[in-house]
């Protein structure tokens, strides 16, 4: 992000302020994505396994409460700049050469139209993509091993807290290093409460996008984003109490 925003003489890469119109369009896009994805889920819900049906019911019952995470974009002017971002940042886009890391595939999320992928965005959206990726790495592996028969349901229940611990620790280490490196940049909120609000919104948006993507391309994988959304609901309820 520091590299992508370093040349303010090139209009294609120069950081830009968020306008009220742009924030409203972000809000509408997020609400539309949630509504479309839930409609697709409900249309196929009857054909899914019992556990997935339960998770979908949980998502539907908390839909309005979850959507409140997007209200920030209507109610408050963002203090950060928007920049040219990766657009689909996750662990699969990061390659280790043996000495350093390389980031690949800057074309953005494949399910989004090109016009949308060309926009400058909040850098925290990429950060949220990485945070979701740590969840995918932990629970995707756990679910695949369970599906193969190497782990039973009891074993899964016993391993789940350890997977969650790894996810939390990895996410914390990544976010801490990111803020230490780029924390003073114009694309990072100086107000940590704003940073949390943005990350909460973008992590939810990413999980909903993943849900729609998996539903259309890899239906057997929808359990991972459903599990992630269930985590979000559980965290919100704990914070509310």
Explain the meaning of each model-derived region.
Residues 88-94:
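Catalytic-loop signature of eukaryotic-like protein kinases
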């Amino acid at each position: 992000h520091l590299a992508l925003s370093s040349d303010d003489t090139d209009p294609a890469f120069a950081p830009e302020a968020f306008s009220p119109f742009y924030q409203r369009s972000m809000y509408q896009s997020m609400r539309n994505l949630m509504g479309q994805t839930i409609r697709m889920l409900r249309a196929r819900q009857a054909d899914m396994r019992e556990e997935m049906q339960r998770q979908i019911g949980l998502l539907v019952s908390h839909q309005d409460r979850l959507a409140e995470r997007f209200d920030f974009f209507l109610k408050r002017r963002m203090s950060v700049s928007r920049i040219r971002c990766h657009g689909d940042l996750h662990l699969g886009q990061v390659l280790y050469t043996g000495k350093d890391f390389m980031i690949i595939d800057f074309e953005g999320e494949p399910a989004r139209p090109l016009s949308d992928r060309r926009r400058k965005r909040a850098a925290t959206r990429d950060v949220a993509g990485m945070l979701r990726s740590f969840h995918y790495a932990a629970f995707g592996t756990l679910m695949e091993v369970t599906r193969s028969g190497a782990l039973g349901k009891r074993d899964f229940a016993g391993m789940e807290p350890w997977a969650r611990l790894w996810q939390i620790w990895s996410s914390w280490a990544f976010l801490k290093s990111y803020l230490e490196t780029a924390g003073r940049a114009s694309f990072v909120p100086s107000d940590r409460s704003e940073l949390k609000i943005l990350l909460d919104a973008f992590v939810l948006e990413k999980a909903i996008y993943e849900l729609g993507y998996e539903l259309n391309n890899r239906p057997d994988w929808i359990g991972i984003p459903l599990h992630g959304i269930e985590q979000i609901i559980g965290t919100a309820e704990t914070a509310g109490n």
